Amino acid sequence: MTDKKAIITYDDQKERDARNELYELLKECPIPEDQVLSNLGLFLNSKNLSRILFMNYIYQKIVDVQGVVFEFGTRWGQNVALFAALRGIYEPFNRHRKIVAFDTFEGFPSIHEKDGDSSMMVEGMLSLTENYDQYLSSVVSTIEKDNPLSHIQKFELRKGDGIVEIDSYLEQNPETIISLAYFDFDLYAPTKKCLEAIKPRLTKGSVVCFDELNDPDSPGETLALMEVFGLENVTLKRFPYVSRISYFIVE
């Protein structure tokens, strides 16, 4: 039976063994509990650190751009937590920099023929543990408590199919301008729908990021971008230390 919580990786056995060993060391960590969080860098490998560096890099590009942050396909929510922390660093009093995360929290809702035939293209793939959205909400709420304006909730988790939730959110929040949109749905249909929905709400300087462009395992993401924006109309860039993430700045 397919493990629908699993992800596709491209590492070899030696790398997997090293990662598993590091995880065991984390579980056995002898650091006092009140000092563990301030020493999490002890367990960061280069791959995971590079993604954090990218999030910092891309967040800096929107500090002077008005608008909220959208993440499409948040899964375990690491990016949401990072964006909340980065907001606390760069603009702690910006109550308008709301972070909105969209996810079914139950895996892929459906597969389109344009999503290809990769082994990951299975309904329900990339599912999460039960009630994970509630846990994630608690984590991000706690992060916000450690920053200014903690009495104002500046994040929202939208649980459900992005095809439906994007219209619902924008109808409920007609004032929405988007400074950063991060796409990690992996799928054609919700990516295309959400690109179409947010396009009129992007401003010059807004940043649009993708996790799976030019990826044979997730061809639908590229096709969605081609159909909504056209590759000839955007300047796709990549961060030199992260292989898979692409982005463009609205010009």
Regions found by a protein language model. Give the residues of each.
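Leucine-rich tandem repeat or coiled-coil scaffolds
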Residues: 2-10, 14
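S-adenosylmethionine/decaboxylated-SAM
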Residues: 13-15, 19-46, 63, 67-251
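Conserved alpha-helix/loop element of class I SAM-dependent methyltransferases that forms part
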Residues: 53-64
